[in-house]
């Protein structure tokens, strides 16, 4: 257990000290890195007046990107399944070919991505759902920086919750992992280990 902790700490430390290697120069790589020169002042990426982000029509009302995101997030947090959202968007009884061309198709695919990302999540803090690897990397950084349990519980959204709510919270395991890493780091320092050397 201590070995794996040391390995993780060493890896995080090494990545922090790495510098990028210069690329070999060649006519091809120079051409790739050369700035793009165009006679046009603007670049049009969108076609057919398409909008970025998903919009949808629900109950005969067109929702803009912000409203669509709010509804999709609400459905995600309430545990709606992809088939139930497909039904709400009017796509369930359509063939795949018809559904792909429907105005709500992009909203459904956005919901599927959100659902998939949430399923892979280990904790939710900062910019949103985080993977287990990213969470553990952040936990180690917080330990090495000397963050207190109160600071970390605040970051993880656990501060001020009752014990029961903390145990049921999605970030509970991440907080327990932080406490474990913190204890291991204190033991290492007690044994004379003060810093990582490369």
From Swiss-Prot:
Primary location group: secreted
Cysteine-cysteine disulfides: none
Motif (RxLR-dEER): 43-52
GO cellular component, one term: host cell cytoplasm
Induction: Expression is induced during host plant infection.
Entry keyword Manganese: no
Protein name in the entry: RxLR effector protein CRE4
